[in-house]
Amino acid sequence: CIRDSNKNLHTNDVVLGKTVKYLDTDMRLIGQWKPFASEFNSDDYLLKVASKVLTDMKITHIAGTIASGGYFVDSPEKVAEVIAATQADAVEMEGAAVLHVAARNDVPALVVRAMSDNADTKYEDFHTFDISEYADTAAKITVNILRNL
């Protein structure tokens, strides 16, 4: 599930993870080992290809900052904390780990996240993002990215 903190983005818009940061991890210790980083970046070439694909598909998107954490950002206070700590455009739970492992193993990678709701949407009220409907769009995005590599 993704929670967006950028008010210019709306449900079904996409954030390409140019920079992805752990939200609730102390990076002082982790950053002492390869890849010696406190944040992680999607591969520049993959970002370029994905951006072209999304533009061609007329999907609103940005290449921005994504924060990955182990909790839902579901209140204005949590949104403010996340923005202050990370300047994130979106919040989710897996992207930093994916890019961290990829960077550690020298593998180019890309994090692509669709907005499912606003960061201040209560979890119980979360219903405007239809995952089954968006799965078709996600598959088309993935296939088009692969075709353009």
Predicted regions and their residues:
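Active-site loops and adjacent core secondary-structure elements that bind or stabilize anionic groups
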Residues: 1
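Mid-sequence, gly/pro-rich, charge-dense loop/helix-turn segments that line enzyme active sites
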Residues: 4-86
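Short, hinge-like loop/turn segments at secondary-structure boundaries
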Residues: 13-16, 109, 128-130
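Short C-terminal domain-edge/linker segments immediately following a structured domain
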Residues: 26-32, 44-50, 95-98, 122, ...
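Generic structural signal for well-ordered, non-membrane alpha-helical segments
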Residues: 39-47, 75, 91, 95, ...
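A structural motif corresponding to the C-terminal end of an alpha-helix
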Residues: 53-61, 101-107, 141-148
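A C-terminal functional module that forms or caps the active site or interfaces directly
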Residues: 72-124
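His/Asp/Glu-rich mid-to-C-terminal helical/loop segments that flank catalytic regions of hydrolases
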Residues: 119-149
